[in-house]
């Protein structure tokens, strides 16, 4: 579709201006999050980047305020709320006729038949929607009406130029695609063409013109465009949005693209007369696809000339949800806004032009909190005259239809449109025509309105009841043109009829339903607030009062200010206790909304209600309590600087009640609310120290200890185990602890903190910014937003983009307006000086003389002491176990305060259990300057207070070493080369450091403040814009001042210049840019290179944040100053405390290092030093407190590693002997050569355990693994964004930016089409396979024969429906194209962003200067350059071998299976000679001194990691060194877990951004596979889901484990994964057979499998879980012959299970062996079943389902390819009886060997001795054994084995063969098939994260365990009639905790569908088990009924039984009888 000329010569100035922006090709966009969309993924790009950028803003169009005058100046905006029409003389004739019809208001009865015919026609016209399909249709249809056309044409033309234009336009709009969402503006009276998608969006409904409703939300405009884009682009794929009507869906399907081509093709012929009208809103009229571009202008002028006719609805109003942006999910995410081709800059221009268009400059200003929450613009008349609906208002008489269509066609034909076009268009036009005029809702409303205004009450009642019905069934589509303005006053009048309760109640309901169906009507309903409140002040009828509360609650979401100022808060709470619980919730929700932006002047409105609200906190109802908490949190937030108000708020028991609320178990507060409440406490303490003192006296320390550690049992000093909490919760809790302590001083050693906090003292608190609502009231922005705006204002920005609460606003400083990006709503803003600003802006308060906290420390030392003792250890533990910098910085501040204010004695007591010194040492080696400064301050305080103790420890732990290093280092803190930080302008640097790295929070630049929302006096006011990271992404940055030419310092190379010219020169400032904070190193570098006084306006895709003109000098100066301070302080420290080295030797503790060094030297491999040196090491490790620093510096680690692993010729002693010596010393195993005859058993492992712990401490201190987290600390409570999701900003970034790619055919191939579409824009998170899908369905995947045409087939955009369907439906599409960037072949399941970042040439150029690990968004260049992606067809030979991942996997390439040797020769050896391969020793793999191949990372701790890996292997496999050892680990694997690495891994895996981009750090995946023992099972399970499967599954897993991630910004719907689901119905009678076919079809599909049973209504999670459980059971049937074990029948058989035998093996199932002579047919059948089992298990893992198969350990070893190391120990796990006999016989073999080695024996005595060797008194020969497998006489162990007896001489061979056949040879074929099946779903190599014994948990869930009542209480949720205190709930928990294993399984299967719980038990059940009350009629007895369940949501519906016995019986009956059926309960 090419750019079209402006064919509207009469267009106004604004139109021609806009044409440049408008005329551009249509964007398609790749949004490939989901495989479900076949075409909606790529955006062909206009070549001109400037023009391309105009895409996003043309959604604006301001709506002036209500104004009923009709003066000349308002001519551009006719008042659509009037019902009188202009005189008919002024109308063209055609319209007089139509109007007369309309006014009769007849129902459309006559046209019904025609309507149906036309729908039939429409259906017949549907073709696969290819862009050209419709234009090729038969031409005939159009010609039949030509006579009529000519007639009408002449009559129209007579009307002269003005009316002709209107008439022409009236019809011209018809052939356009009447937008699937009708004209927004009409109903709103707001008439703007809003989306480029087409002017059709404006021309879709007949009566919009006549609409009286005035309240379009600006959002609706966006929606229109979005839906059209979707309809146009993703016809074959994307499912229609939920709220679109079915007719509309049809429309969008059939109307897809055909209607656009003719417009494009024929528009040049159209030349319409000039129109006088200017179109302020028609942002893109020229290029709108559906019709000749001039037609829209006509439409508008038509609308103007015909002004008002009678009310009649537009066909459909765009469905407006609360947030109009929520639709941007999934694969079309990018189409919704970008796809339209509208740019933000264009929108800005549109806004400016609109200002010109409206002479009075009226702007619509929206009421109250709409800016912060849901946008609800309500202006009355529109600022532009294109109302967007066709001006037809007839009721649809059939006679007029033909003539209308005819006239329309005639007119268009006369304008040069060929008649054949009307063939395909005719039926559709008339169908749309019918829809627009046939809807009777509006006319019905008019009739009812008359009824409401009647004088007769019965008539009024009837009318109001019908009005309720109309509204409750309606939505925005069906209620188009509803006369809100007239209906509301009429309803308000009825509401005041005090004597008639019925009428009042229904009137109240009608208003509520109206706000639900038409959200914008709330602006008009606001007038009813006083009347609603009247109903609450004097309650005459409780129903009316409750209904009024419901209405007020809806109003309060947008108009809380109006309610507050009408005194509504107190009125709503007046009779709170009288209402039902739902009404109470509403009342409290209103209160919370009223507090949202309350100002100190309005405090009197709430003051009286505070006691009541405080008391409400003790209530049991969760929702009420949360609303009340929200209320207080908002009050505290808004009054945080008003100390006296804070005290009033907290006066009435508030602190006590909240404190109790925090510790209630089970918790009432959700995670987000918990964070908010704790934050509220912090704010109170920080700003009002007296409240802090009050809390201390109320024993807040115990509360905090409980919240962090759970209930303490005994001494809290010993072992501190933290309760698992999210980083955000930890952050707020540590903040609170920090605020409870007095502030630190700001002089002396703490003076540097001022530098850390404030870069330059720019004061952003100096002013308050406010915006004005509809009523002219001013509302303040919340604190953070206000700071962002002020910061931008101070540096002279023209405008900034502010993203808050899911909306994006442009703040325009020139016009002082705030403009909503989505909707174009504009509001006035103003700046007011902040009276409070000067009280305390320095960021540090002077220690006030009356800081009550400091006073308390002096006056009540006991209280202070207990506080510090209770919390110091906990803080310390939080610091050690947190990876996020925000939490660590906050902990550090709190610890510093405690250490500073505690006296020496207390400190000694508190610190004695903590290795403070080694922590300080590792902090000093951190790369984060903030941490280094804190560590130096701490060291200084400790040396001042406890010099004797710490002078020794600081030496031993390496503190002194590090401080000296800091004092001497020239280039301070230069990090390892990989992490160079110079010039980054960031202190919270991102280099690998113990503190974790680049957090989006670290403020890169002079504001070195922590990301955290510091609330304290000393920290609090540093809430710089990034306090909430500001969400600032700016587009246009033309600073008002300063030259416009960039001057760069000499760049490093040409590429840099190029990069800088195109990319933002993000000069950073104290308040820093968004991306700089994400990766200071990368983005900061640009700032260091550009001269700050001459800033080029950065224009790229929003990559720069608040780019500020802060001089380079200030930034680097500040950093340099801090570095200088560190160096100077370190120097002073050494001088003061360690200058005299005379202390050496004076303290015995200092000798440890010497001893260790001496022992280490003796671990020499060349000289045999015996075991003495090991004994010395053992004593040092286990008896002295050797420090990590000493271990590091003695060379011990490296030497021990070599000692245990080296295998060189030169070694004096062999490795095996060294290992045995080591085991002897550390584990008391026998020395080499002294093994006993009996079993070698583990004795004492304490020394080895001590060594492991010491090594783990070393690892924790040395490792510097980077963590890519994006700590986005929360905003404040007032905006409700209290848990603003970390990572969501960056996700937003990905949602709003696309990569520019050029698709090119690979030079190597010429047999596929060449892409001619120019550059495309691709969603960065789309997968590479989305590009393939996009190209293949357009025919680019077809390989041409040589003789076919080359590239001129011109059918680029033709979509092959069959291929599209194939892509949609099949999980296993054959790949047709492969893609390259440069030489690199791209994996299909890689995101495009990852591919570009990893392989693009630019990426390679940049990598030298970028620390790739830590930068999630890549360099600016990634977003500005065009990346070339080559495609070529997949070669046949490659296809078969390719391991295609991402759900389209073929068989993965894996190592050849090492089962019994495959080739014939070896087979012969086994069969003929009985020679079997020797058992592999698993230890060998680990005993290497160098890193294994799959460890590629570098880290200072690498040697320690390798040593721990060796120690773990020795502990796990030591028994392979002895031939008679007990098979048992020395040390449990759990002892090897490293808490610091675990914290880092967990933190990393909780970050949505990292998971979405697949950007997991390499160290984590590599350690996870090579050293899984460092991490607990659940961490590895999460890591497995993140790395093994697609991104959506990883996100789903993340959301299941951390539900709070999705609690914030709902518009970030991209966080929500889009997992396809495939549903299959199966028959219970043939379950196994059907399961096999389901797995055959869908096993390898990426879609989630859902199962339903024939003739049962249940569907969803429960039946699916039961399917896996039942199939597992079917596979255990004895008749299948799959397993070893005994046959049993089920204890509680159902249906077909009766009489069926099943296999049971208490040790676990293992495959039944085959002999050499087994029948091939039988083998094939069994192999098929095993292949199916492999698929089933892999699919279960992939879909988070559980199977119920009790498999044995050897089975899992086979899965992990460990079959070569199976020994007789493993035999015990499949057949204990045989295994015991084998053990006895092995003992005989060992005795025989001893005898043979005994030199003293003669031949005769040896013979005699051998004959006396017996087993239970029998000689071997007497046992009567032959060479067959025990238990399987038909399986021979070697050829002719039946006839070979076992004797003492061949006993050893016999035992080897038995073990080999039972565990390997006999079962290898089954396991090969199993592995094949498994790998067809995903590669088995991904299971390397687990040990064999853990796979059972992964597959089958948690082990059977008794359930205790306490756990049940914490994990189960009573609801709907029950609470934790209900009798029935207590009964239930008591019963469940008494269940045995079988009863547990029955109960679980009944309630959840699966007999097993996931790992973690009830705690991990998702959704949680919910117990609800089953209700009955009053006449019924609950004891007569059984409980029922909803398995999909784990609901147990439990009657309230009279006794525990009855409940127990009923539960067991239900559980037994309720199996295997899903019917309605």
Curated annotation (Swiss-Prot):
> Which Gene Ontology terms cover its molecular function?
nuclear thyroid hormone receptor binding; ubiquitin protein ligase activity; zinc ion binding
Residues modified as N-acetylserine are: 2
Listed under GO biological process in this entry are: DNA damage response; DNA repair; DNA repair-dependent chromatin remodeling; heterochromatin boundary formation; proteasome-mediated ubiquitin-dependent protein catabolic process; protein polyubiquitination; regulation of embryonic development; ubiquitin-dependent protein catabolic process
> Which residues lie within the region annotated Disordered?
1-404, 970-1077, 1440-1466, 1601-1620
Presence of keyword NAD:
no
Comp. bias intervals (Low complexity): 154-166, 175-216, 379-397, 983-1006, 1062-1073
- Using the record's annotations, give every residue carrying the modification N6-acetyllysine: 181, 1458
Q: Where is the composition biased (Basic and acidic residues)?
A: 48-70, 346-358, 1050-1059
Q: What is its EC number?
A: 2.3.2.26
Domain of life, per lineage:
Eukaryota
InterPro entries per the UniProt record, alphabetical: ARM-like, ARM-type_fold, HECT_dom, Hect_E3_ubiquitin_ligase, HECTD1/TRIP12-like, WWE-dom_subgr, WWE_dom, WWE_dom_sf
Q: Which residues carry this modification: Phosphothreonine?
A: 1410
Q: Does the record bear Transferase in its keywords? A: yes
What is this enzyme's catalytic activity, as reactions?
S-ubiquitinyl-[E2 ubiquitin-conjugating enzyme]-L-cysteine + [acceptor protein]-L-lysine = [E2 ubiquitin-conjugating enzyme]-L-cysteine + N(6)-ubiquitinyl-[acceptor protein]-L-lysine
Localization annotation: Nucleus, Nucleoplasm
Q: Where is the WWE domain?
A: 755-869
**Residue list for modification Phosphoserine:** 12, 77, 85, 100, 310, 312, 975, 1024, 1030, 1049, 1063, 1350, 1355, 1362, 1409, 1460
GO CC field: nuclear speck; nucleoplasm
PROSITE patterns from the xrefs? Answer: HECT, WWE
Described by its record, this protein's role is as follows: E3 ubiquitin-protein ligase involved in ubiquitin fusion degradation (UFD) pathway and regulation of DNA repair. Part of the ubiquitin fusion degradation (UFD) pathway, a process that mediates ubiquitination of protein at their N-terminus, regardless of the presence of lysine residues in target proteins.
Assembly, in brief, is: Interacts with MYC; leading to disrupt interaction with isoform p19ARF/ARF of CDKN2A. Interacts with TRADD; leading to disrupt interaction with isoform p19ARF/ARF of CDKN2A. Interacts with SMARCC1; leading to disrupt interaction with SMARCE1.
Q: Which family does it belong to?
A: Belongs to the UPL family. K-HECT subfamily.
Q: What is this protein called?
A: E3 ubiquitin-protein ligase TRIP12
Q: Which organism is it from?
A: Rattus norvegicus (Rat)
Q: What is the lineage of its organism?
A: Eukaryota, Metazoa, Chordata, Craniata, Vertebrata
């Amino acid at each position: 579709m090419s750019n079209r000329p402006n064919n509207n010569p009469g267009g106004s100035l604004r139109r021609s201006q806009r044409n440049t922006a408008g005329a551009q090709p249509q964007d398609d966009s790749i949004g490939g999050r989901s495989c479900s969309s076949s075409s909606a993924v790529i955006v062909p790009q206009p070549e001109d980047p400037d023009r391309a950028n105009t895409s996003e803003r043309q959604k604006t169009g301001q709506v002036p305020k209500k104004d009923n005058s009709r003066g000349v100046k308002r001519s551009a905006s006719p008042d659509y709320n009037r019902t009188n029409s202009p005189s008919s003389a002024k109308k063209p004739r055609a319209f007089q006729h139509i109007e007369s019809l309309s006014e009769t208001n007849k129902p459309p009865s006559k046209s019904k038949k025609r309507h149906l015919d036309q729908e039939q026609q429409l259906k017949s016209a549907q073709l696969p929607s290819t862009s050209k399909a419709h234009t090729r249709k038969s031409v005939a249809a159009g010609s039949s009406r030509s006579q009529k056309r000519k007639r009408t044409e002449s009559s129209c033309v007579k009307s002269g130029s003005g009316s002709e234009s209107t008439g022409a336009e009236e019809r011209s709009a018809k052939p356009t695609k009447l937008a699937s969402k009708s004209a927004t503006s009409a109903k709103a009276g707001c008439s703007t063409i809003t989306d480029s998608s087409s002017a059709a969006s404006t021309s879709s409904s007949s009566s919009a013109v006549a609409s009286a409703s005035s309240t379009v939300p600006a959002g609706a405009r966006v929606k229109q465009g979005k839906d059209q884009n979707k309809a146009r682009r993703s016809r074959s794929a994307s499912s229609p949005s939920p709220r679109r009507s079915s007719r509309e869906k049809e429309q969008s399907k059939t109307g897809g693209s055909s209607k656009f081509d003719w417009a494009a093709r024929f528009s040049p012929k159209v030349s319409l007369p000039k129109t006088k009208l200017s179109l302020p809103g028609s942002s893109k009229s020229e290029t709108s696809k559906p019709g000749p571009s001039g037609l829209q202008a006509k439409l508008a002028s038509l609308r103007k000339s015909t002004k008002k006719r009678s009310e009649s609805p537009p066909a459909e109003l765009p469905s407006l949800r609360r947030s109009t942006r929520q639709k941007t999910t999934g694969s079309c995410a990018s189409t919704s806004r970008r796809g339209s081709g509208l740019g933000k800059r264009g929108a800005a221009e549109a806004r400016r032009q609109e200002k010109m268009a409206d002479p009075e400059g009226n702007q619509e200003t929206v009421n109250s909190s709409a800016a912060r929450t849901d946008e609800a613009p309500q202006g009355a008349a529109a600022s532009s005259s294109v109302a967007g609906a066709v001006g037809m208002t007839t009721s649809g008489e059939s006679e007029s239809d033909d003539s209308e269509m005819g006239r329309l066609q005639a007119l268009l034909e006369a304008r040069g449109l060929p008649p054949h076009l009307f063939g395909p268009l005719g039926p559709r036009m008339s169908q749309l025509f019918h829809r627009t005029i046939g809807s009777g809702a509006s006319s019905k409303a008019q009739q009812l309105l008359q009824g409401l205004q009647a004088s007769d009450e019965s008539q009024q009642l009837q009318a109001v009841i019908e009005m309720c019905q109309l509204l409750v069934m309606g939505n925005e589509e069906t209620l188009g043109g509803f006369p809100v303005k007239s209906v509301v006053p009429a309803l308000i009048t009825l509401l005041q009829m005090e004597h008639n309760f019925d009428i009042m109640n229904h009137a109240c309901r009608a208003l509520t339903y109206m706000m639900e169906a038409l959200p914008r009507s709330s602006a008009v309903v606001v007038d009813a607030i006083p009347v609603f409140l009247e109903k609450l002040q004097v309650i005459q009828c409780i129903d009316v009062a409750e209904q009024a509360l419901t209405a007020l609650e809806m109003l309060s979401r947008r108009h809380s200010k109006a309610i507050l100022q009408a005194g509504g808060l107190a009125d709503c709470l007046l009779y709170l206790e009288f209402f039902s619980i739902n009404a109470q919730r509403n009342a409290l929700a209103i209160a919370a909304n009223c507090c949202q932006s309350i100002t100190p002047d309005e405090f009197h409105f709430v003051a009286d209600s505070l006691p009541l609200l405080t008391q409400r906190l003790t209530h049991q109802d969760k929702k009420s309590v949360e609303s009340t908490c929200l209320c207080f949190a908002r009050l505290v937030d808004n009054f945080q600087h008003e100390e006296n108000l804070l005290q009033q708020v907290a006066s009435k028991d508030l602190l006590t009640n909240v404190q109790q609320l925090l510790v209630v178990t089970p918790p009432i507060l959700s995670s987000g609310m918990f964070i908010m409440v704790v934050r509220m406490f912090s704010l109170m303490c920080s700003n009002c120290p007296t409240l802090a003192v009050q809390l201390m006296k109320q024993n807040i320390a115990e509360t905090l200890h409980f919240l962090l550690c759970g209930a303490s049992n005994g001494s809290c000093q010993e072992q501190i185990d933290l309760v698992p909490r999210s980083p955000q919760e930890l952050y707020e809790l540590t903040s609170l602890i920090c605020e409870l302590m007095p502030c630190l001083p700001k002089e002396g050693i703490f003076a540097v903190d001022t530098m850390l906090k404030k870069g330059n003292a720019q004061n952003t608190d100096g002013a308050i910014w406010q915006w004005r609502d509809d009523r002219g009231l001013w509302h303040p922005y919340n604190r953070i937003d206000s700071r962002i705006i002020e910061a931008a204002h101070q540096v002279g920005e023209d405008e900034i983009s502010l993203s808050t609460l899911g909306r994006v606003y442009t703040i325009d400083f020139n016009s002082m307006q705030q403009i909503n990006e989505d909707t174009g709503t504009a509001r006035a803003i103003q700046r007011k000086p902040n009276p409070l600003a000067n009280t305390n802006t320095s960021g540090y308060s002077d220690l006030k003389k009356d800081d009550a906290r400091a006073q308390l420390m002096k006056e009540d030392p006991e209280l202070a002491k207990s506080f510090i003792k209770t919390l110091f250890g906990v803080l310390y533990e939080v610091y050690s176990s947190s990876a996020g910098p925000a939490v660590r910085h906050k902990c550090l501040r709190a610890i510093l305060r405690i250490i500073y204010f505690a006296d020496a004695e207390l400190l000694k007591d508190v610190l004695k259990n903590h290795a403070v010194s080694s922590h300080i040492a590792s902090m000093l080696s951190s790369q984060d300057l903030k941490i280094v400064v804190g560590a130096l301050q701490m060291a200084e305080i400790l040396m001042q207070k406890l010099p004797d103790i710490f002078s020794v420890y600081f030496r031993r732990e390496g503190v002194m070493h590090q401080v000296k290093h800091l004092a001497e280092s020239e280039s301070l803190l230069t990090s390892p080369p990989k992490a160079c930080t110079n010039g980054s302008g960031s202190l919270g640097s991102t280099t690998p450091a113990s503190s974790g790295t680049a957090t989006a929070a670290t403020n890169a630049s002079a504001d070195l403040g922590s990301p955290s929302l510091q609330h304290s006096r000393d920290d609090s006011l540093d809430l710089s814009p990034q306090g909430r990271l500001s969400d600032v992404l700016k587009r246009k940055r033309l600073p008002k001042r300063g030259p416009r030419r960039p001057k760069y310092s000499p760049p490093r190379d040409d590429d840099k210049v190029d990069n800088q010219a195109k990319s933002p020169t993000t000069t950073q400032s104290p308040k820093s840019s968004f991306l700089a904070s994400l990766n200071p190193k990368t983005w900061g570098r640009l700032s260091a290179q550009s001269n700050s006084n001459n800033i080029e306006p950065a224009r790229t895709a929003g990559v720069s944040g608040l780019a500020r003109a802060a001089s380079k000098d200030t930034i680097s100066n500040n950093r340099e100053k801090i570095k200088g301070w560190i160096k100077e302080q370190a120097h002073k420290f050494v001088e003061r405390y360690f200058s005299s080295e005379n202390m050496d030797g004076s303290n015995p503790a200092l000798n440890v290092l010497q001893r260790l060094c001496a022992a280490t030297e003796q671990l020499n491999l060349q000289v045999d030093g015996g075991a003495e040196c090991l004994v010395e090491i053992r004593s040092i490790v286990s008896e002295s407190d050797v420090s990590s620093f000493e271990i590091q510096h003695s060379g011990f680690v490296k030497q021990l590693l070599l000692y245990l692993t080296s295998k060189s010729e030169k070694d004096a002693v062999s490795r095996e002997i060294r290992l045995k010596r080591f085991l002897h010393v550390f584990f008391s195993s026998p020395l080499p050569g002294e093994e006993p005859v009996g079993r070698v058993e583990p004795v004492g492992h304490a020394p080895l355990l001590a060594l492991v712990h010491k090594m783990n401490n070393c690892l924790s201190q040395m490792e510097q693994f980077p963590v890519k987290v994006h700590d986005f600390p929360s905003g404040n409570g007032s905006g409700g964004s209290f848990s603003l999701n970390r990572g969501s900003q960056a996700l937003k970034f990905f949602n709003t930016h696309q990569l520019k790619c050029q698709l090119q055919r690979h030079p190597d191939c010429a047999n596929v089409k060449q892409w001619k579409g120019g550059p495309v824009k691709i969603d960065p998170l789309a997968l590479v396979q989305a590009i393939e899908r996009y190209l293949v369905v357009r025919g680019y995947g077809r390989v041409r024969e040589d003789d076919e045409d080359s590239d001129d087939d011109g059918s680029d955009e033709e979509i092959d429906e069959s291929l599209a369907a194939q892509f949609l439906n099949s999980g296993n599409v054959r790949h047709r194209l492969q893609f390259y960037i440069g030489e690199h072949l791209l994996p299909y399941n890689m995101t495009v962003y990852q591919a570009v970042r990893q392989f693009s040439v630019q990426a390679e150029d940049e990598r030298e200067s970028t620390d790739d690990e830590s930068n999630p968004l890549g360099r600016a260049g990634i977003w500005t350059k065009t990346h070339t992606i080559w495609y070529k067809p997949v070669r046949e030979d490659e296809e078969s071998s390719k391991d295609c991942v991402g759900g389209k996997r073929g068989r993965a390439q894996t190592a050849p299976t090492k089962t019994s040797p495959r080739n014939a020769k070896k087979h012969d050896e086994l069969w003929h000679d009985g020679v079997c391969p020797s058992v592999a020793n698993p230890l060998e793999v680990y005993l290497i001194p160098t890193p294994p191949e799959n460890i590629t990372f570098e880290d200072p701790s690498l040697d320690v990691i390798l040593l721990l890996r060796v120690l773990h292997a020795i502990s796990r496999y030591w028994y392979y060194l002895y031939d008679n050892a007990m098979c048992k680990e020395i040390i449990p694997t759990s002892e090897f877990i490293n808490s610091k690495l675990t914290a880092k891994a967990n933190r990393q895996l909780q970050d949505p951004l990292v998971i979405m981009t697949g950007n997991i750090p390499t160290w984590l995946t590599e350690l996870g596979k090579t050293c899984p023992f460092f991490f607990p099972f659940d961490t590895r399970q999460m890591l497995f889901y993140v790395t093994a499967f697609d991104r959506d599954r990883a996100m789903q897993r993340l959301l299941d484990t951390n539900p709070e991630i999705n609690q914030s910004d709902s518009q970030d719907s991209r966080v929500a994964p889009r997992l396809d689901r495939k549903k299959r119905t199966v028959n219970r009678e043939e379950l196994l057979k059907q399961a096999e076919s389901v797995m055959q079809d869908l096993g390898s599909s990426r879609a989630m499998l859902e199962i339903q049973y024939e003739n049962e209504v249940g569907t969803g999670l429960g039946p699916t879980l039961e399917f896996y459980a039942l199939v597992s059971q079917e596979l255990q049937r004895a008749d299948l012959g799959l397993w070893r074990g005994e046959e049993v029948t089920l204890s509680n058989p159902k249906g077909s299970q009766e009489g069926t035998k099943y296999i049971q093996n208490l040790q676990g199932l293992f495959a039944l062996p085959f002999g050499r002579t087994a029948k091939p047919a039988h083998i094939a059948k069994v192999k098929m079943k095993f292949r199916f089992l492999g698929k089933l298990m892999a699919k279960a893992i992939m879909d988070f389902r559980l199977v119920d198969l009790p498999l044995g350990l050897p089975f899992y070893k086979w899965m992990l390819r460990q079959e070569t190391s199976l020994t007789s120990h493993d035999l015990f796990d499949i057949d204990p009886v045989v295994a015991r006999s084998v053990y006895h016989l092995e003992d005989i073999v060992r005795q025989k060997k001893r005898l043979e080695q005994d030199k003293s024996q003669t031949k005769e005595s040896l013979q005699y001795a051998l004959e006396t060797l017996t087993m239970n008194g029998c000689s071997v020969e007497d046992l009567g054994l032959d060479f067959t497998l025990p238990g399987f006489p038909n399986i021979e162990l070697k050829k002719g084995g039946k006839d070979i007896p076992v004797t003492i001489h061949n006993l050893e061979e016999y035992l080897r063969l038995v073990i080999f056949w039972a565990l390997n040879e006999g079962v290898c074929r089954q396991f090969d098939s199993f592995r094949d099946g498994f790998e067809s779903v995903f590669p088995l190599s991904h299971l390397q994260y687990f040990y064999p014994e853990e796979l059972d948990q992964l597959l089958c869930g948690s082990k059977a365990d008794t359930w205790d009542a306490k756990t049940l209480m914490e994990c189960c949720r009573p609801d709907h009639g029950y609470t934790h205190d209900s009798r029935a709930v207590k009964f239930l928990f008591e019963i469940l905790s008494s269940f045995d294993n079988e009863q547990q399984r029955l109960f679980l299967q009944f309630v959840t569908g699966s007999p097993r719980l996931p790992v973690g038990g009830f705690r991990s059940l998702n959704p949680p088990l919910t117990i609800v009350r089953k209700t009955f009629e009053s006449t019924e007895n609950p004891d007569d009924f059984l409980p029922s369940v909803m398995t999909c949501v784990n609901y147990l519906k439990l009657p309230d039984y009279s006794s525990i016995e009855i409940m127990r019986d009923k539960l067991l009956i239900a559980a037994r009888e309720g199996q295997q059926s899903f019917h309605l309960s």
